[in-house]
């Protein structure tokens, strides 16, 4: 279940190893956010009335990883040191629902109730999005409900490499 490798291929410690789901549909999986900096922005869109779920857009930030030559070029050209990924409304809600306390079936049901035909087929679309977030190293799958082994909330910089955001529209609390 554990790949043991991070976003850029470096070996991760055992307590932060990305969990992988071994094939098939994600039935019974508990998707859980890994420690990554994220925040909310914008007005609330459609969302279920649940704790920790706002319906706002989610912005993910993580340090850019460069090869030696790319790093030299980035410093010379003063390129950005981080990547920002703003999720759309459906993926933002999916992100907020992935706290490790809801299983895949519950999440799909909530997405379907919220977005109706916009997200059809909900199971396939949710699975594709979750697998992509897993591949990027932002999310893991557990066979059991998450026991809060690591922080999953907004504003956490596990790398210690990100600058404090100057964008006042980002809510990382």
PLM feature segments, named:
Residues 1-34, 76-173:
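Long, charge-rich, low-complexity alpha-helical segments
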